[in-house]
Amino acid sequence: MTESTSRRPAYARLLDRAVRILAVRDHSEQELRRKLAAPIMGKNGPEEIDATAEDYERVIAWCHEHGYLDDSRFVARFIASRSRKGYGPARIRQELNQKGISREATEKAMRECDIDWCALVRDQATRKYGEPLPTVFSEKVKIQRFLLYRGYLMEDIQDIWLNFAD
C-alpha cells in the first residue's frame, strides 16, 4: 500500500473499491458486502481495510442511492444471462439463493421475465443430442438427466416428447 492510500479514510477507500467492483458488472448486496470485506491484495500480500461496520453500511447506502446497487436489476439481468447460457429456472433460482437474493424477489422476477422455458428446454436437447430426439428409453433417460442438471423442470422436459409427434 502506498503512503497516500494509507492516509485516505477507510470510508473513501471502501467507496472507491465498491464503485470499481460495480463498474465491472451488477452484484447483489450480499456479494458486494462479501467482496468489500475481503482483504485487498497489496504489494506485500493481503491487506485489511480497517473500516467500521458503519463505514460498510454508509458505502452500501451510497451505492443504493446513486443507482450502482439494485438487487431487482441484478436479478433481472442474471435471469436473462443464465437463460441465454442454457440454464433452466430451477438452477437459476438456486444460484440466486446462493447470491443472497430473497425467494420473493426471485419469484417476482421469474414471473416478470419473458422467457419461454419450453422452447429453451427443446433447444438445449436438440443442440446437445441432435434432431430428431432419440425415442429409445435409455437415450431419453440420458437426455432427461442432462436437462435436469441444467435446471429445467420435469414437466417441461417431458413436454418435448409429448409434442414430438406434432
Curated annotation (Swiss-Prot):
The keyword Glycoprotein does not apply. GO terms for cellular component: cytoplasm. It comes from Shigella sonnei (strain Ss046). Keywords: Cytoplasm. Its main location: cytoplasm. The gene is recX. This is Regulatory protein RecX. Belongs to the RecX family. Transmembrane segments: none annotated. One of its GO terms (biological process) is regulation of DNA repair. Modulates RecA activity. The keyword Cytoplasm applies. Pfam families: RecX_HTH1 (PF21982), RecX_HTH2 (PF02631), RecX_HTH3 (PF21981). It is found in: Cytoplasm.
